[in-house]
Amino acid sequence: MAYQMASLKLEMNEVVHVKPSKPTPSIVLPLSTLDHRPYPDSIWPIVHVYRSASNGKLDPAFVLKQALSKALVYYYPLAGKLVKQPDGKVAINCNNDGVPFLEAIANCNLSSLNYLDDHDILIAKQLVFDLHLQDENEYPHPVSFKLTKFQCGGFTIGMSTSHIVCDGWGACQFFRAIVELASGKSEPFVKPVWERERLIGSITTQPMPNPMDEATAAVSPFLPATDVMYELFKVDKESIRRLKMSLMKEISGNETMEQGFTSFESLAAYVWRSRARALNLNNEGKTLLVFSVQVRQHMSPPLSDGYYGTAITEGQVVLTMKELNEKPLSDIVKLVKESKNIAFTGDFIKNTIDTLESNPENFNVEEGPGATLALSDWKHLGFMPNVDFGWKEPINMVPAPCNMFEYEGLCIFLSPSKYDPSMEGGVRVFISLPSVAMPKFREEMEALKVTTP
């Protein structure tokens, strides 16, 4: 069931700043080299969707604010402000400024929005806190919240997190701590640690090369575009199984695979090729697939469980459009697997950090319009914690298409919502494309349901 933007109207309360419930240290904390990988103003907003409680007596805004206040005792840097240091780097001033919290009341039921399970997710933009900065030199708050109550008793929690402070794993850890405290726990199960000094690089005279340059990057006739669409595509478990089976048939008899292909590797290659086809990239131009690789447990020694800063490197695969379009898909999947395995190694992690410390511009890929696809896998992050704080677990979670999620070259793999049982074991693919390119991409994704690639 589709919905229209006009079906949602919100009545806003005044913004409040939620502070830690106990005194916290007043200190300026430096960030790591990897923390500086995103732009300082990069905010990634997500919306958690909850059904109404069985008793209906609890006020979700009150419960969440109380739990947030307790969580900030442990995560007190998130109640501070980002500041620029004399050396140009960013730090957190732990000044107890508090977390901006906005409460809103909607004029409809969540069921009328299909619990945000439809492909049209632009409505999610209204459910996150768009805090406009008064000064262009000012940085956003590390985190902010918007809780929207619906007429049915259900609600959404829009959490906007600064990517320079937390990566996806860290943001999930923080959100889980809030939910645990809201459920009555006396403390979070995982205690946060700062330890950003573990990921500070050294100046190197041999930085990693830029994977692609502007002169050789592929271009699309559809970009730049002013009319961009955002969609969520559902890929069920059977479609993924069929895709992986077809890949194994391609390599059968030609070579021995010690390991099969994962769902991520298979779908990453397929989506990369499908997007490139939809954008009609020029044949001789190069296209880059870059995807986040979590390295917490691959450090030596591994990072502490409570580490919530950025701890990701990037797997990278570069092909010409002709190669991407004509190679067997299994060859492309193998390149994804190889790149992922390299990104896990200690040498690659160290070289990434040292290169970022020495030449951060090497990570700002100059590209022709549409040449790069940046892929992030959220399926195993735990954004929908199985913790009941009065409303059971969230039924859905979606990214809101604003700030860094407005980037045309971004794609996110998400777990299915619990609203659609038929999607158990499947994947949702969030992607943005020029409107003129979306029909072709949709056709490619539909092909997964009926035929082998």
From Swiss-Prot:
Q: What are the protein's GO molecular function terms?
A: acetyltransferase activity
List where the protein spans the membrane.
Answer: none
Identify its protein family: Belongs to the plant acyltransferase family.
Q: What does this protein do?
A: Tetrahydroanabasine acetyltransferase involved in the accumulation of quinolizidine type antinutritional alkaloids (QAs). QAs impart a bitter taste to plants, acting as repellents and toxicants for herbivores and predators, and possess a variety of pharmacological effects, including sedative, anticonvulsant, anti-inflammatory, antiviral, antitumor, antipyretic, anti-hepatitis B, antifibrotic, antiallergic, antidiarrheal, analgesic and antimicrobial activities. Mediates the conversion of tetrahydroanabasine into ammodendrine.
**Which pathway does the database say it acts in?**
Alkaloid biosynthesis
Tell me the subunit arrangement.
Monomer.
Its practical application is: Disrupting the production of quinolizidine type antinutritional alkaloids (QAs) by selecting inactive tetrahydroanabasine acetyltransferase variants is a potential kick-start for the domestication of novel legume crops.
- Name used for this protein in its record: Tetrahydroanabasine acetyltransferase
**What keywords appear on the UniProt entry?**
Acyltransferase, Alkaloid metabolism, Transferase
Which Pfam families does the record match to this protein?
Transferase (PF02458)
Loss of this gene results in the following: Foliar and seeds sweetness associated with the accumulation of quinolizidine alkaloids (QAs) pathway intermediates and their derivatives, but lost production of quinolizidine type antinutritional alkaloids.
* Provenance organism: Lupinus angustifolius (Narrow-leaved blue lupine)
Q: Is Acyltransferase there in the keyword field?
A: yes
Which InterPro entries does the record cross-reference, listed alphabetically? CAT-like_dom_sf, Plant_acyltransferase
> What EC number(s) is this enzyme filed under?
2.3.1.-
Tell me where on the tree of life, at the top rank, the source sits.
Answer: Eukaryota
Q: Which GO terms describe its biological process?
A: alkaloid biosynthetic process
Q: Which reaction does it catalyse?
A: tetrahydroanabasine + acetyl-CoA = ammodendrine + CoA
Keyword Acyltransferase assigned: yes
